[in-house]
Amino acid sequence: KIMQKGDPYAHFWEKKPLTASISWNFEYDWKDKTWMGSRGKHNSLQSPYVVYEVHLASWMRPDPFDEESYFSYWQIAQRLVPYVKQMGFTHVELMPVMEYPFDGSWGYQGTGYFAPTSRFGNPEEFMAMIDFFHQEGIGVILDWVPSHFPYDSHGLFMFDGTHTYEYADMRKGFHPDWNSYIFNYARGEVRSFLISNAHFWFNYYHIDGIRVDAVSSMLKLNY
């Protein structure tokens, strides 16, 4: 059986239901130098963080009765920043924005670990959103899911016809609660993939932190 796979390192993907990887060059001109230069000096004991968690797909829609109706990254930023500032939050925590096929997963079953979802625009538009948050004094934290991934045929599962990213023993490699596959942390290549991915979002997208999801399934085998 021939499977069509996406590039695990792709920076952009076609909008669902299409699944092709798209080449992208990073040429964004960041304007958050002041924020980036000052964030390391922040003392959380004197100025605590107040974090607003948000799911971009459902926080606000152009048509509230159409679940396939989305604002762009920039349109979301224009609406979300004033609200966050008015409510007194210092940071937003974005539920997973890495490309994912199934809306019902809320992004927690991703296939494109190096790409912001194309539901709301392209990588440069996502950069512009983060840049705008920073210029307005708001930090950005990403939910990050290094624990499991879905079985979609274009994704990581059985990537080269073998158990490349997941455990071969399905007692360890399959999570019955989520109907998804567990990363094989025993493989150096898999650890490198995940660590590189975390660094990628900090270096290329200027994020301020990550919240690691489902750590219990990474540490324990009683799933």
Q: For the regions a protein language model found, what residue spans apply to each?
A:
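The feature marks proteins involved in alpha-glucan
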Residues: 1-51, 61-64
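Substrate-binding/active-site clefts of carbohydrate-active enzymes
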Residues: 40-46, 55-223
